[in-house]
Amino acid sequence: MQINADFCLKMEKISAVYSEGRVVVPAQNEANSLYQDGYGSLLSDSRLLTLRPFEALYLTEREKISVVDEKSRERLDFQGLIWRFSDGDPNIWTRYVVYRDLRARGFVAREGPGHGVDFLVYERGSYGKRTPRYLVHALWEGTQEPLRHLGDMLTAAEDAGRILRLAVIDRRGEIVYYTLSEMNLQEPEENSF
């Protein structure tokens, strides 16, 4: 079978600019396209799309965007971005690894509201139609997490009608998701164990 070169189209990378610790997509059509796919946030005053660091890393790794440093005019690769982002967020690698996994599983993940919640995650196919179903907290295996902190995140999730998931990254980089729910411990009945 012979393939006609005229029918093979190479997707052009979307141009993005790194400026003051953030990545912005200035072209409105490209910004809207990414936004519709669940990436970034649109700045209403300028119609620019601002990508979160983990989104910029993911899109750079997937060769969807090409990032240029506004000051030096040099093209930034994945490694260059990770170095710049790690200055402002020591947990950027953890967030990126979990974000990449969620996207690979077909979920849209947005930045969490804070207080330890890393991501708001939508059910597959529900982005733009329904509210996020899950709150995800990312951590490495063996990391100590205070129970009070987990309890606060669980309360916030339940108050919002969402499910809290812990994304635990093991030493091989594999991720296991655990669902947290409230457990009521009761005293045993009189004649039971």
Regions found by a protein language model. Give the residues of each.
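Short, well-structured beta-strand/strand-turn elements
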Residues: 104-116
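Conserved phosphate-interacting/catalytic interface
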Residues: 1-99, 108, 125-193
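Beta-rich nucleic-acid/ligand-interaction surfaces
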Residues: 115-124
